[in-house]
From Swiss-Prot:
Cleaves peptides in various proteins in a process that requires ATP hydrolysis. Has a chymotrypsin-like activity. Plays a major role in the degradation of misfolded proteins. The active site is at 101 (nucleophile), 126. Its EC number is 3.4.21.92. The lineage of its organism: Eukaryota, Viridiplantae, Streptophyta, Zygnematophyceae, Zygnematophycidae. InterPro entries: ClpP, ClpP/crotonase-like_dom_sf, ClpP/TepA, ClpP_His_AS, ClpP_Ser_AS. It comes from Zygnema circumcarinatum. CDD domains: S14_ClpP_2. Keywords: Chloroplast, Hydrolase, Plastid, Protease, Serine protease. This is ATP-dependent Clp protease proteolytic subunit. One of its GO terms (biological process) is protein quality control for misfolded or incompletely synthesized proteins. Belongs to the peptidase S14 family. Its main location: plastid. It is found in: Plastid, Chloroplast stroma. Component of the chloroplastic Clp protease core complex.
Amino acid sequence: MPIGVPKVPFRIPGEEDASWIDVYNRLYRDRLLFLGQDVDDEIANQLIGIMIYLNGENQSKDMYMYINSPGGAVLAGISVYDAMQFVVPDVHTICMGLAASMGSFILTGGEISKRLALPHARVMIHQPASSFYEGQAGECMIEAEEVLKLKDCVTKVYMQRTGKPMAVISEDMERDVFMSAKEAQAYGIVDLVATDDEPSTNTPFDYGRKW
């Protein structure tokens, strides 16, 4: 039987008794964000809202986004990426499990030098796909033009964030390209790979201990 989202005690400053809140809300208070599902408008709006709130609350403390996502909607992913660049604090990105498609796009949007992959994480890049399969020819042409614009946008971001030539990015995105954590580091999508003998990035609650 599913147990739902675990709850943990949290005491609001100034109050004597702790209340029970879900674990994600507790971690948000320590500027830890989670993308653990398909990228869609709902999760994108949640992440953007949290980042904007935390930005207004304290612009000197970094944020940490943990990613385990197969990807999803292109515009939703781009909106999260743009918000990460908009907020003043640095946003660390940490890949756990899989960061594919828009998941890898968001992963590479973390502050350069502060993008981390766990040792057995996987990363995948490919070009944006159209979801418009039926309709008038004119509508298909309009959508095809939009997909090409989105592909150009995504390719340019990967180029800027990885340092790879645009021709290399464009060629690699023509198909699904899977990478290990070390391969993603060599490609420039992440900067660090956590290992047993290296500390990861420092985060609240001693999340910076050795993995």
